[in-house]
């Protein structure tokens, strides 16, 4: 059976030679991202800054392309469209307009008129202004979701492996997330509930990649008791390199269409996922692994049963 090999089986790349460069680069980018988070800050979407919510039903399946074009030309800032329920039901969200409640009503009336002109027969079923308190609650819930996901992953790694692996995984995840947030700050892309979904997806992908590498490290710790930890980590990464690169490449290729032709709703999501796949893959090699090396092999090897390996050959009865 044919097996695709992106790298030869006996590859021996000394990844740990680049551990300092990897950690320093990662720390620099994460610190810069934190600074950018505070200044100039994130471009919060309608979900997190309030706005106007309009529910409408079109006579036929909604034409989202025409609606985006028509509503986007009103000059009212961000306009988000979402299908809910049937294909005829449309949820329209506008950013909050300058002024008081009367200004919000004027904006809603403009949307009504545009809907009637673009898709005659459309019924507006609900108009509601989303205040700052609701938006703040959505933002808090999004942050809570990321925090709970982080804790759950820490506990999973901690119980499946040892605390050193859990610490390395969580520190690496934090560095990964800060870079993604910095990307949002630099590009000015909307930070909304879709952004939260993208970050959670990247977190899941990243931890899965690290579990594969960590599992091989744990296995090799039991097999090669006398091998220096630095060499063992390099060996483990090289042994899983085909799997890591293959998974990353397949994920990357599957997300490219979202980033290129996903439309307004999915394009930002796809772009962030592409960046996240790259960050997660490189961090498994140049961040998570060096953290284990710095924790020291005495802690990692403690309690590991003796096994055959270089310098510790198996004995036969």
Name each model-derived stretch.
Residues 1-317:
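A structural signal for conserved, well-ordered secondary-structure elements
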